[in-house]
């Protein structure tokens, strides 16, 4: 499955010149924990999360009215292409230690975002489908297989 198929397409964004106060306010209004930092033509420049604000601003007792998103955002931004597989996206997230990947088109414009939770939900759904498809067949072949709901001692009798 391609990442674009499981992406969120209405992405919460912010520009780098906004204050951290503006950023936190926007996160609150949009009920999100992260924003993709973009320039005027919607090219991603970085990411900023509520965790970044807590650790880099609040914990250091800095003034959120004086700092800009540019001062705190994570750069460079790690992205994915729309046709990449979820396996490739997961590998990239792991390699770079990120939980979200903005998805950009061939021109570098933002077209969506995918998070590790999106990928885990999709993988979980796929695994569930596989189990529902193949587990009954396996039980037909081996009806005496161990099950989790019966203690091993009962299987030995």
Predicted regions located by residue number:
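Tandem CBS (Bateman) regulatory domains
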Residues: 1-10, 49-79, 85-94, 115-157
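A generic short alpha-helical patch detector that favors 3-5-residue windows
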Residues: 15, 43-45, 61-64
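Short, flexible active-site loop motifs that bind/organize anionic cofactors or intermediates
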Residues: 9-13, 43-44, 79, 109
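Low-complexity, intrinsically disordered short peptide segments enriched in small/polar/basic residues
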Residues: 8, 17, 33, 110, ...
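Short acidic/polar alpha-helix capping motifs at helix-coil junctions
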Residues: 1-3, 17-20, 32-36, 52-56
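A glycine-centered beta-loop-beta connector
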Residues: 27-30, 35-51, 93, 101-118
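The conserved cystathionine-beta-synthase
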Residues: 13-31, 38, 80-97, 104, ...
